[in-house]
Amino acid sequence: FPEDEDVRRIDYHEPNCRYKQIQMYASRGCPRRCNFCAAATLYYDELNWRPRNVASVVEEIRTLHEKYPGMEGVFFDEEVHNIKKSFNISLAKAIRSAGLDHLKYEAMCEYASLDEEALEEMRAAGYYKIRFGIETGSDKVAEKMTLGKKHDLDKLRSMVKFGKSLGMLFYGTISIGGLGSNQEEDQKTVDLVYEMASKGWLDEIQVSINTPQPGTDFYNTCMEESLLSNSTNWEGFDGNGQVVVHYPHYPAEEIQTNFNKALSAFDFGKEEAQTRVFSKNAESSFNLIPDGARVLLLRCVRNWMIRLTLENLNKKASVDLLGQNVSTKDLKDLDGLDQIYSYGSGFFSVESIPLELIEKLRNKQYDFVLIPVANNHLQGYQNVLEVAETILPKEILYVYPEGHLQPAQPVTI
């Protein structure tokens, strides 16, 4: 098993998971050669997929759980967990036989290789979320990206619909601005995101700008076709909001616009799908906030959750919002907001917020600061909590995605 003596793996559990899940690998490699992916050209020297021995995987889970009682589950974070149906069924059955099906399991998969029988076995073993790369809603772009068998939108819809009937959650990744894309083709991706989110099929999303990393086929094509600037700024190659490819037919500004549209499409679709569940729970949970309370809402999650939180406060409270400049622009016209405070850019932290703004917020004497959160273990929200404590409200409450409120730890003064 991986080294776990001087480095405690539980201390590095994946913060982007809903539960406290330790990362594991049940397989190595990938049989696909997507043009933007480094796995085929840098990580491995050939296209293959090699699963581990099932008994070894189960023994690693058992060993970790015995060593770390606080461990809540496993995140199988390999390239692709489900190329071979028989492997997934065998692993799921072995997990159940070992009495480890009370843990929460999440896995990086390929939707085109999902199977109904395997999904049923995985769900019964404790798998609660599947992650996969959708990449694009365009057949034309998929061909240029060399997605091959990985791209099958009919299979995507049928497998996700079936998985939802089992109670499975799905996390999709998409990219904008890939080889072969243009305004029309990327709009198909935006439309697909909204369709899946509004039907309740897509629970979480990661949107990237398709970026040619050195060593990938995409990068080599860009070099051959002079699609990269001569004065390359490598800091822009993170896929997170910066466009480095220069298509003559598809300006960087349009790619950036479609990147933002894809995020907004998820927000609006997710809000549409989640409204009933959130509002049902909020009906009782939000009674923690009395009429006339002074509330500051921190914008530290996607906008769909901010909108639902405001909607379910139902004007019972006076609500202000604190967030980044770029995020607050999309929220300025929302009903139920009295005042929006922008602190600039960067993640929530006490250091990122000007002292004069902190003093102004303290003077408002808020009854509550609300911190919307996307996971149960609250990993990644410590800085946000420190900001809330610095503002000195009477009470701090977490808002969970299903509409529940929970008091945070006492304010440190």
What kind of feature is each model-predicted range?
Residues 2-170:
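Radical SAM [4Fe-4S] cluster-binding motif and immediate context
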Residues 4-11, 16-17, 21-23, 184-282:
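C-terminal accessory regions of radical SAM enzymes
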Residues 40, 77, 133, 208, ...:
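Conserved residues at the C-terminal ends of beta-strands
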Residues 65-66, 70-77, 102-106, 125-134, ...:
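Conserved C-terminal portion of the radical SAM core fold
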Residues 73-75, 129, 294, 367-370:
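Structural motif
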Residues 110-111, 135, 175, 210, ...:
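Histidine-centered beta-alpha loop that forms part of the nucleotide-sugar donor binding/catalytic region
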Residues 281-302:
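Nucleotide-activated donor-dependent transferases that construct or modify glycoconjugates
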Residues 296-310, 315-412:
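Active-site and donor-binding regions of nucleotide-sugar-utilizing enzymes
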